[in-house]
């Protein structure tokens, strides 16, 4: 508890000196690490005031698309999105890229980025590696789903072994004191992933709760903040979001993926469900324009999907967003200062030497 207060005080002092209101908040995991608690408090402090720019990267490409954002704008995203993948060989989604991805996440955190991680989990009836449509976008029968949620059943045990592999990677980040916005079973109100499209208490939300229990109570992954995620009902076969909510006690952040227009109704609906929790755009294709943030100010971060930053957005829009006054990139003192305060407090708590400040937006290696 003393350690937690140490990091909290460091962040609170920085925010107070910067003129930002310090928002105390409690993670859903009562044993959350000091760094996870401080990150959640920071997200609450910027809610309604600023939005962190974020960029997704496939597991086997390093920081390619984060570097592309810098090439396009001269600014690094403030949030780095990694992925655990599902395929094999040299594919961009290859599971062989996981060890390097974890090391890249550590580097990005040291350099001042917030971290979020996604996992396109394979069906528990399959073995990695798989193809996207053959497993991730395939389905389970109702009988298989029931068995998956039955403790001790053969399929439940296969699922445990499957998720325990990912827990091992997340433990490396826990031991490195890296807080992670973890977004499991994303877009669960849609029917395009095997885990999605099952509303109600024994549906997709039950699987999310089962994973929470495994990661928190068995593996003690206390560095995770839990970012529950749904897809916007933008003409797709996505169900009513409330029917997929696991409960306020399982979500630190309430997030929505939007590919298309940023309809004000989506924002209103997610706010109504989130209450005082921070909200986020878990994935986007087309970037939200600066005007969107004027009418939808409570988005605390967005994450653009990999190559879409270059191939799906006009250069003028990308630069307008990254240079908007309410958008936080890695070099912005409103983001860089608080995250540096968290890392400094961690180092002092552990008795480590102070870290060297990273160079300001170094050009990525070619």
Task: Walk through the language-model features, giving the residues of each.
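Aromatic-lined carbohydrate-recognition surfaces of secreted/lumenal glycan-active proteins
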Residues: 54-56, 183-185, 208, 212-239, ...
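Loop/turn elements at helix/coil->beta-strand transitions in domains of secreted/extracellular proteins
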Residues: 48-51, 75-78, 110-115, 175-181, ...
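Substrate-binding cleft of extracellular glycoside hydrolase catalytic domains
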Residues: 90-221
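Alpha-helical scaffolding within the catalytic cores
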Residues: 37-39, 61-71, 99-103, 165-169, ...
């Amino acid at each position: 508890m003393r350690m937690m207060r140490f990091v909290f005080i460091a962040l609170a002092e920085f925010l107070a000196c910067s003129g930002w209101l310090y928002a105390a908040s409690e993670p859903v995991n009562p044993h959350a690490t000091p760094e996870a608690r401080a990150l959640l408090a920071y997200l609450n402090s910027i809610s309604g005031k600023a939005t962190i720019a974020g960029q997704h990267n496939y597991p086997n490409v390093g920081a390619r698309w984060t570097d592309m954002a810098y090439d396009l704008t001269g600014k690094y995203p403030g949030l780095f999105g990694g992925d655990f993948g599902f395929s094999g060989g040299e594919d961009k989604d290859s599971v062989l890229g996981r060890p390097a991805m974890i090391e890249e996440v550590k580097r990005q955190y040291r350099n001042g980025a917030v971290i979020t991680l996604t996992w396109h989990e394979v069906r528990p009836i399959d073995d990695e590696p798989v193809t996207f449509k053959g497993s991730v976008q395939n389905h389970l029968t109702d009988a298989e789903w029931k068995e998956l949620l039955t403790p001790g059943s053969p399929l439940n045990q296969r699922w445990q072994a499957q998720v325990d592999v990912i827990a091992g990677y997340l433990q490396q980040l826990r031991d490195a004191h890296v807080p992670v916005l973890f977004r499991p079973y994303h877009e669960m109100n849609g029917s395009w992933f095997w885990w999605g499209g099952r509303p109600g208490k024994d549906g997709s939300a039950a699987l999310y709760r089962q994973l929470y229990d495994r990661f928190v109570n068995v593996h003690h992954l206390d560095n995770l903040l839990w970012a529950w995620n749904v897809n916007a009902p933008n003409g797709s076969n996505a169900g009513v979001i409330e029917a997929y909510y696991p409960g306020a006690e399982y979500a630190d952040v309430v997030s929505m993926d939007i590919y298309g227009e940023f309809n004000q109704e989506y924002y209103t609906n997610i706010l109504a469900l989130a209450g005082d929790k921070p909200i986020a755009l878990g994935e986007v294709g087309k970037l939200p324009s600066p005007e969107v943030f004027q009418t939808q100010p409570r988005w605390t971060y967005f994450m653009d999907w990999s190559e879409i930053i270059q191939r799906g957005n006009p250069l003028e829009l990308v630069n307008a967003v990254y240079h908007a006054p309410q958008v936080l990139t890695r070099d912005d003192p409103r983001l860089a200062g608080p995250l540096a305060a968290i890392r400094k407090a961690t180092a002092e708590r552990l008795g480590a030497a102070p870290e060297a400040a990273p160079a300001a937006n170094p050009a990525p290696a070619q």
